[in-house]
Amino acid sequence: MASSQTSQTVAAHVPFADLCSTLERIQKGKDRAEKIRHFKEFLDSWRKFHDALHKNRKDVTDSFYPAMRLILPQLERERMAYGIKETMLAKLYIELLNLPREGKDAQKLLNYRTPSGARTDAGDFAMIAYFVLKPRCLQKGSLTIQQVNELLDLVASNNSGKKKDLVKKSLLQLITQSSALEQKWLIRMIIKDLKLGISQQTIFSIFHNDAVELHNVTTDLEKVCRQLHDPSVGLSDISITLFSAFKPMLAAVADVERVEKDMKQQSFYIETKLDGERMQMHKDGALYRYFSRNGYNYTDQFGESPQEGSLTPFIHNAFGTDVQACILDGEMMAYNPTTQTFMQKGVKFDIKRMVEDSGLQTCYSVFDVLMVNKKKLGRETLRKRYEILSSTFTPIQGRIEIVQKTQAHTKKEVVDALNDAIDKREEGIMVKHPLSIYKPDKRGEGWLKIKPEYVSGLMDELDVLIVGGYWGKGSRGGMMSHFLCAVAETPPPGDRPSVFHTLCRVGSGYTMKELYDLGLKLAKYWKPFHKKSPPSSILCGTEKPEVYIEPQNSVIVQIKAAEIVPSDMYKTGSTLRFPRIEKIRDDKEWHECMTLGDLEQLRGKASGKLATKHLHVGDDDEPREKRRKPISKTKKAIRIIEHLKAPNLSNVNKVSNVFEDVEFCVMSGLDGYPKADLENRIAEFGGYIVQNPGPDTYCVIAGSENVRVKNIISSDKNDVVKPEWLLECFKTKTCVPWQPRFMIHMCPSTKQHFAREYDCYGDSYFVDTDLDQLKEVFLGIKPSEQQTPEEMAPVIADLECRYSWDHSPLSMFRHYTIYLDLYAVINDLSSRIEATRLGITALELRFHGAKVVSCLSEGVSHVIIGEDQRRVTDFKIFRRMLKKKFKILQESWVSDSVDKGELQEENQYLL
């Protein structure tokens, strides 16, 4: 029956190849008119076929939606995320086509952003894949639009269920049944960027005159296609409706000088600009829905009913009995009940996943109301909506609040409010006209926003050094579109910095011309960044660049940002929020960038906020504290730092050939054997000295582990040896073989050699050990303490991870602490329920690595429920008292995971 219904759709008859050839013609169209003509021809033929297929039938639900969701994939809301990026597709193609990993075509796919010089497709993965696939694929595919959508549905659902093998299987079906041209467009649909050269508004306007407006108030592509299938029939009422996500009204950036004029010389409202997640709430009785500004549904997180979620249970009783239904617009905030303050988004938390965060709670800050009961309020004035909002619910501190507003008349009041927001470390202020009506997806229209970074001179700016780059995509293909920036480790007085810590990635603030000019300036200095052998002068966090540049060849850029926030992606342990390049500091040399000390001082100055100055009326937007003048560049005599000077070996007499032509780099010596003395002795034995290790350096000698030595160790390119080894060589006048006791650090090849010669404690497999050496070996063996099972759990987990046993089914629950619903009364051990399947489940959990507890308290990660689900509500109430929230799952999650040998997606078993 289902297949019969499917065959009665236009999408089941239209080949995917026809859609792709249409998209190809649209993209290649010379002008807008030609592009529109090609799309209209395809749309008209679809509608004609639809009329022929469904003639004389009423209530037909078939529409243009199957094609529209592929043409405008960025507006897709029904399908979940694919979880696929260009790199994954590249690896899949390499595997499917059996391409040599180091071959030309495989490297093209893997390094698609790197310009090749031959073509202008750098950064366009779909085009590069097309040319690789063209000689290897079918001339024409066999899939229909319906089949493509069904396979993409499978990709999305299996990605959500973390079933990677099934994701791969569906992708293979798509790939093996498509031509190279079809795969080019398929890739763009998956990546959600078609590059057609016409906007979604143009597509909508061709489809139907009311399409843009209907999509703004519903964000539902399928509803637009169904309700507006007939271009000759319009909608009489297009307005915000209950449980349909709408695109919210937005604020325009304001010029402080023009505020009074923009408000038409009338009074206006000033509100705090909140730093949370824009969210709309739809309520009908005890049924709730929550939607983000882009129309994504977050009801599962915040709660569909008063019995579930991180918000709904706490606000349901705030609504009066006379309020059956309503639609609210506001900001979802993270509230700290201890300090009674809102958290800023820059701090590490996700408001949409607050159940996992301890010490914080979800708070809905409401600033507008669009419907109460059956009365729609979008066309009412803001003043009227505010009056209605105040009687819609009773605010509950830290759970649901009304954003406070003040009435103002002058520019001075706006300036005072902005300065007050700066003092309170807030994001900024909103200015709203009392007579404005609510216009979905419109920016401005009576709403303005003012943030400190919009006002010249209010922000502290940072002078940072470019140390890495990322190849661009699309219009920026073939050039660096983003840069990795760093600050310097504070050098000793009189020295230049030699080590730089990454701080942020920046990709905005400059025009294409400025980007091109900067690219030309740095082009010849870029080097590929290898994660296994990073440059010792650039220390990265988890964020690594695609290419890097030696600091002395780079330039300083001046960056403006909103604030400094914590981040483990960068070596500094922090990064910049909303960074953008203000200008290139041609007046500064590379070593004059800010240091870690400067960064720390800025971070402590205003809790990380970079807006610390006040604006004053009549100052022409200049702050009281004047801008720093650029530091003028003074001519300095060229000199070499003392510790990098080559030693004076003119008076050295050669006494041995033990180190003939062997290169050493001495970083430091020992008490009684300073660096210069060791260098002289090496020269006497025929060796020669360098001040920076290179590929020909035999080893680095270090008496202490300073910053330079640590950087050399982190690069993993050179062996680092104690000076004691040199002293042994000088004493015996031979090149003494290395032993573990001499080594500070070993590069990979040396480690392999030592692994064949010595055990993990440094005891040789082949050479007899004397008493002193044996004592050293014993000192390196630490006695193991008696540990409880609880203490052993992380040790076992570490061993499993070290030896790659952590993927074994026997350890699948290793990191979980689990409470089972075995007691009629929570935490009353005397109320144990006998003869229940959960007793066996507890044994299965222990056998597969879980820690099973009989007391429900902080630290429990999961609660498992059997067939008797009467206590689920009790567990949810108990959970609200805990800082770290546990998940409540059906027992079948355990049994299914054990049966299938891997953890199953938890969301399918949630109660």
UniProtKB/Swiss-Prot annotation:
Region Required for catalytic activity, residue ranges: 610-620
List of residues binding ATP: 271-274, 278, 331, 345, 367, 427, 432, 449, 451
One Gene Ontology CC term in the entry: nonhomologous end joining complex
Alphabetical GO biological process terms: base-excision repair; cell division; cellular response to ionizing radiation; cellular response to lithium ion; central nervous system development; chromosome organization; DN2 thymocyte differentiation; DNA biosynthetic process
UniProt-recorded Gene Ontology molecular function terms: ATP binding; DNA binding; DNA ligase (ATP) activity; magnesium ion binding
Binding site for Mg(2+) 1: 331
InterPro entries reported in the protein's UniProt record: Adenylation_DNA_ligase_IV, BRCT_dom, BRCT_dom_sf, DNA_ligase_ATP-dep, DNA_ligase_ATP-dep_C, DNA_ligase_ATP-dep_cent, DNA_ligase_ATP-dep_CS, DNA_ligase_ATP-dep_N
Keywords: ATP-binding, Cell cycle, Cell division, DNA damage, DNA recombination, DNA repair, Ligase, Magnesium, Metal-binding, Nucleotide-binding, Nucleus, Repeat
UniProt binding sites for Mg(2+) 2: 427
Summary of subunit composition and partner proteins: Interacts with XRCC4; the LIG4-XRCC4 subcomplex has a 1:2 stoichiometry and XRCC4 is required for LIG4 stability. Component of the core long-range non-homologous end joining (NHEJ) complex (also named DNA-PK complex) composed of PRKDC, LIG4, XRCC4, XRCC6/Ku70, XRCC5/Ku86 and NHEJ1/XLF. Additional component of the NHEJ complex includes PAXX. Following autophosphorylation, PRKDC dissociates from DNA, leading to formation of the short-range NHEJ complex, composed of LIG4, XRCC4, XRCC6/Ku70, XRCC5/Ku86 and NHEJ1/XLF. Interacts with DCLRE1C; the interaction is direct. Interacts with APLF.
Function according to Swiss-Prot or TrEMBL: DNA ligase involved in DNA non-homologous end joining (NHEJ); required for double-strand break (DSB) repair and V(D)J recombination. Catalyzes the NHEJ ligation step of the broken DNA during DSB repair by resealing the DNA breaks after the gap filling is completed. Joins single-strand breaks in a double-stranded polydeoxynucleotide in an ATP-dependent reaction. LIG4 is mechanistically flexible: it can ligate nicks as well as compatible DNA overhangs alone, while in the presence of XRCC4, it can ligate ends with 2-nucleotides (nt) microhomology and 1-nt gaps.
This protein's name: DNA ligase 4
Organism: Mus musculus
Lineage: Eukaryota, Metazoa, Chordata, Craniata, Vertebrata
